[in-house]
Amino acid sequence: MREIVHIQAGQCGNQIGAKFWEVISDEHGIDPTGSYHGESDLQLERINVYYNEATGGKYVPRAVLVDLEPGTMDSVRAGPFGQIFRPDNFVFGQTGAGNNWAKGHYTEGAELIDSVLDVVRKEAESCDCLQGFQIAHSLGGGTGSGMGTLLISKIREEYPDRMMCTFSVVPSPKVSDTVVEPYNATLSVHQLVENADEVMCIDNEALYDISFRTLKLTTPTYGDLNHLVSAVMSGITCCLRFPGQLNSDLRKLAVNLIPFPRLHFFLVGFAPLTSRGSVGYRSLTVPELTQQMFDAKNMMAASDPRHGRYLTASAMFRGRMSTKEVDEQMLNVQNKNSSYFVEWIPNNIKSSVCDIPPKGLKMAVTFIGNSTAIQELFKRVSEQFTAMFRRKAFLHWYTGEGMDEMEFTEAESNMNDLVSEYQQYQDATIDDEEGGEEEEGGAEEEARQRKHYVIDYVPSVCVILIR
């Protein structure tokens, strides 16, 4: 089996994670005690992806729950599925990270990291064929961002060839939970660029908009928002868990979505999203799902795909449908909106079809897009970071934990590089003489052509000139 070990870090990660396990357990017919009460063999066929079978036919999630303070853990334990988790897999400190990335990454988090890695190792050892890890965390706080990224880099050292997929809640443009969010997020992105394989970017503001405008919820709670995130999380792995006509997994996803190693930050979406009142008035068809899936209002991060171009995208359909129709719709979307797709990657939408729809729906689709528009998100954080860092505001909280200003400067320039890489590929055309090199100036390009010129015409002089 292709197992996935799930890790949730910090308050946000644990709340998303708790909701995710409710959704997944429901799909597989597992009740809050871990017993199976489903009605189809398909629910059990590949249940090992996310669950361990324990004695007495109980199913235990392959989940590791991490936090630097006990509060959220207690709420997860007291929640609807709190008793399903293995008690040893709750790893928590007492002090908290106080929204400070340095505490999570270097001091408090570093003290707890070995206990977490022991639990992760135990989970990985109980797998037949571990496919990878998925981590739910936020980038704005202290634990999820600081300790979450520390955990990612440690796991990457120990399991370099396994997939590392993160569901990262990024700071919202208008709604801010903490003042030092831009610092924490920039330092985290600096780590994620190097150590993660796939980063699904989610932000609360976009989730609020979806709940408010599309789902018509007047006062959406975090529970409602987390439900949206878990719909995407379950959609990404449904092909691993249920039989399908066209399968996909974390590695196939990465191979099809990431044209250049650093550009692995994705926009995610889900369809159908309709308010309870209007469910009866809409038909669920593949064209309808496709149209909604590419709608900017459906994106779970505040980046508008119309402001950039898709390098690649992936659509994971669920339910009984014809693969021919799926292929036609994908082609149709690309032909009609060709200006929003880069022309130097032909057929850049990957699709997969899984036969089992989510609970309560006839068909659904999960969308993952690698769009250059995601640079808006990084630009926003970067501007806020620069404004504070120029005045060295709040810096003493970080340097007090042993951090160096240099690390901030490096993180800032890494993020700015990322933005300009996205911009570069957004502007690139099929005829560009890019040669695949990333940071190549015009002068170097000219010099290179001159070299070719010499090689072509005067082979004997060539050696002298190049030296």
UniProtKB/Swiss-Prot annotation:
Residues reported in the UniProt entry to bind Mg(2+)? 69
Stored SMART domains: Tubulin, Tubulin_C
Q: Tell me which PROSITE patterns the record gives.
A: TUBULIN, TUBULIN_B_AUTOREG
Please give the residue ranges the record annotates as the region Disordered: 429-448
Q: Which keywords label this protein?
A: Cytoplasm, Cytoskeleton, GTP-binding, Magnesium, Metal-binding, Microtubule, Nucleotide-binding, Nucleus
What biological process terms from GO does the record include?
A: microtubule-based process
Presence of keyword Nucleus: yes
Gene3D superfamilies annotated for this entry? Helix hairpin bin, Tubulin/FtsZ, C-terminal domain, Tubulin/FtsZ, GTPase domain
Which protein family is it in? Belongs to the tubulin family.
Q: What does this protein do?
A: Tubulin is the major constituent of microtubules, a cylinder consisting of laterally associated linear protofilaments composed of alpha- and beta-tubulin heterodimers. Microtubules grow by the addition of GTP-tubulin dimers to the microtubule end, where a stabilizing cap forms. Below the cap, tubulin dimers are in GDP-bound state, owing to GTPase activity of alpha-tubulin.
Q: How does it assemble?
A: Dimer of alpha and beta chains. A typical microtubule is a hollow water-filled tube with an outer diameter of 25 nm and an inner diameter of 15 nM. Alpha-beta heterodimers associate head-to-tail to form protofilaments running lengthwise along the microtubule wall with the beta-tubulin subunit facing the microtubule plus end conferring a structural polarity. Microtubules usually have 13 protofilaments but different protofilament numbers can be found in some organisms and specialized cells.
Q: What is this protein called?
A: Tubulin beta-1 chain
In which organism is this protein found? Physarum polycephalum (Slime mold)
